[in-house]
C-alpha cells in the first residue's frame, strides 16, 4: 500500500517470488482488488513468480497479469536420473531444463503442465 500511495503513476509491479500471493492471498486481494480494472486493461501490469495454490485462483480472478512458474514435479522426476548419470560418469545437460508454466487470466485453466 505504501509503494502504491507513494507512486501514484506506477504502472507495473513485479513480484519475484510467489509468497505474497500464496502466503497471504487475502491481503494481496485487498491491495490489488481496487486495481482490477486497470489490470484487466493492461494499464497496470502485475507479474509474479510461481503457479501454485492461490496464485492460480488470483490469476483466474484477474488480479495478476501473468504468472511464470517452475515445474517442481519435473524437477523431482528428473533429479534421480540426472544424479545416476553423474555417478556413472555420463554426460548430462547443463542446465537441465524442466520447463516453465506461463499463465494469464485467459490461459489459467490450461497453462499448468505436470
Label the model's feature ranges:
Residues 1-114:
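A residue-level marker of the well-folded mature domains of exported/periplasmic proteins
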Amino acid at each position: 500500500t505504501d509503494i502504491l500511495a507513494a507512486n501514484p503513476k506506477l504502472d507495473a509491479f513485479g513480484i519475484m517470488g510467489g509468497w505474497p500471493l500464496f502466503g497471504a492471498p487475502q491481503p494481496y486481494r485487498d491491495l490489488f482488488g481496487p486495481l482490477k480494472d486497470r489490470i484487466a486493461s493492461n494499464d497496470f501490469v502485475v507479474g509474479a513468480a510461481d503457479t501454485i495454490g492461490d496464485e492460480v485462483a488470483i490469476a483466474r480472478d484477474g488480479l495478476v497479469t501473468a504468472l511464470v512458474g517452475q515445474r517442481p514435479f519435473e524437477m523431482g522426476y528428473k533429479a534421480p536420473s540426472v544424479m545416476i548419470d553423474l555417478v556413472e560418469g555420463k554426460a548430462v545437460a547443463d542446465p537441465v531444463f524442466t520447463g516453465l508454466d506461463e499463465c494469464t487470466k485467459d490461459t489459467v485453466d490450461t497453462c499448468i503442465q505436470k
